[in-house]
Amino acid sequence: IVSQDSCNDSYFSDTVRTILLSGLVRANFTNELSWNPFEIGQGTVTQYELFKDIGGTFTSVATYLPGDSLFYIDDVAGQDGNNGSFCYRVEATYNLNIPSIGVNETLVSQSNILCLEQRGKIYVPNAIVPNGVNNIFRPVLVFSNDQNYSMKIFNRYGEVIFESADLNTGWDGTVNGRIVQGGVYSY
């Protein structure tokens, strides 16, 4: 940008390259983030800081120095309280020094906010051993909403022998308090 004052003196603005944060969702419960370096003609970046939205507040999760790789892998396994949605932003702290006009300040530039969605997964056991190692049959949901959850267990005659709408309530291999006969049961 060029501006001219009343004396016909021209002033040119500095060029700036903003931070663009991008990312990929990976199947192994990780989010891969990367961003370009912030650039400003008469400024020097002193650090980059990566923030993650945790409970509605952006919290610092990593700090980088200029010259570091601008890349982060966020392991989100076990963080399913937000149904698989994760939001991030990057801040660049820089010193702006323009001696000709007496400017020497430390400033911050923010990237875009990037939100990534992990896909929901369901893990279902393939066997139950009443009074054994795997004594409760119930699926485990990761990054899924259990609002419409329903599970039914059927015997070999197609009769419902267990039913639950509560994800935390699994089948213990009993019907009316008695352990069922070994065999195949469908769900």
Put a short name on every predicted segment.
Residues Q47-N83:
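Recognizes extended acidic, P/S/T-rich segments that occur
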Residues A27-E32, P66-F71, A165-L167:
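Ser/Thr- and Asn-enriched, surface-exposed coil loops between beta-strands
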Residues V45, G81-C87, D146, G182-V184:
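Extracellular Ig-like/FN3 beta-sandwich strand-entry sites
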